């Protein structure tokens, strides 16, 4: 029986970490490398990756060995897609915003105030349109294995934000997302696209004034330390696509592929069920650390919705009205 170990407990560099990890795999086992950009624990994606590796390494012992590389140790999300096609890694879970070079359909998840809450996101993911959307990139060699939620996004800045006009003239870090860029412009603010690993330093040095993220990202990356509080807007979902290359998945023996995908499906359901509690816990940790969380009044929240929702019209043709309708209908189910 192999022992599962995260790359994070090895040396700080990949050159030192790689041999230590290789020793955890047995001769003849298929090595599955999973690269992601967040903390190894205490974060919904990091915890889900660990859970997946533990299940694979236990239940597929002798067949497969999964190694997890957190905190951009191997690749950031901008480089990992090429690495998947080259076979340098087998699994990644970038934010859905990161796939614009391959499909515009995932812009759906960036639309502001589309989903009411995480339960709505889960219902859409389980629906037929949501499942079909996993295959949006098969023509370029990628296949989605599941959606991993991280939570709803909040805004923070170096000054209090209560209504959109408070953000006028500020510079906000965003992911590589045209929807997010349009949303920030609708606030009268400026968008700056930066890699996740660069955000803390950019906030600390004033390269950007603010950012938008989940409670888990804000806490585990310590963004709250260099911001004047967080405004609880819940304006977007942050979700990740667990993705692999179609070539790698198709090359597995049928029984291995079936067992692996069954584990992936079960871990996805279990991990997503835990997100709301993890987000609430990290929100409380931010408060306990002495940061300020600003809760909007209904009138203030309406001002954010009114400012941002017109952005939908700019991207309706890219996404498809049918997908937008399916996502909206998930708010009314359950």
Q: Model regions: which residues?
A:
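Positively charged n-region of N-terminal signal peptides that target proteins for export
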Residues: 1-5
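Bacterial N-terminal signal peptides
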Residues: 7-15
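Sec/Tat signal peptide C-region and signal peptidase I cleavage site
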Residues: 16-22
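N-terminal secretory/targeting leader peptides
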Residues: 23-120, 128-334
């Amino acid at each position: 029986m192999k022992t599962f170990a995260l790359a994070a407990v090895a040396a700080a560099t990949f050159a030192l970490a790689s041999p230590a990890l290789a020793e955890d795999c047995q001769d003849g086992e298929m090595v599955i490398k999973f690269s992601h950009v967040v903390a190894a624990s205490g974060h919904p994606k990091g915890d889900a990756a660990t859970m997946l590796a533990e299940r694979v390494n236990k239940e597929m012992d002798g067949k497969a060995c999964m190694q997890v590389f957190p905190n951009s140790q191997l690749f950031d999300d901008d480089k990992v897609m090429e690495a998947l096609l080259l076979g340098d890694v087998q699994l990644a879970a970038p934010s859905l915003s990161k796939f614009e070079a391959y499909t515009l359909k995932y812009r759906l998840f960036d639309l502001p105030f589309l989903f009411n809450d995480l339960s709505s996101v889960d219902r859409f993911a389980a629906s037929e349109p949501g499942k079909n959307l996993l295959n949006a990139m098969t023509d370029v060699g990628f296949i989605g294995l599941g959606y991993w939620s991280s939570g709803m996004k909040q805004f923070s800045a170096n000054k209090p934000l209560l209504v959109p006009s408070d953000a006028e003239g500020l510079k906000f870090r965003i992911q590589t997302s045209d929807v997010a860029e349009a949303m920030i412009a609708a606030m009268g603010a400026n968008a700056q696209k930066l890699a996740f690993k660069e955000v803390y330093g950019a906030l600390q040095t004033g390269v950007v004034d603010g950012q938008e993220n989940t409670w888990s990202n804000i806490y585990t990356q310590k963004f709250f330390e260099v911001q004047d509080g967080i405004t609880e807007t819940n304006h977007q979902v942050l979700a990740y696509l667990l993705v692999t290359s179609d070539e790698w998945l198709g090359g597995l023996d049928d029984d291995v592929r079936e067992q692996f995908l069954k584990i992936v499906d079960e871990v996805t359901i279990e991990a997503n069920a835990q997100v709301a509690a993890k987000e609430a816990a990290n929100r409380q940790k931010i408060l306990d650390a002495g940061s300020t969380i600003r809760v909007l009044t209904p009138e203030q929240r309406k001002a954010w919705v009114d400012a941002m929702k017109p952005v939908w019209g700019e991207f309706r043709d890219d996404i498809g009205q049918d997908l937008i309708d399916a996502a909206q209908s998930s708010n009314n189910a359950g």
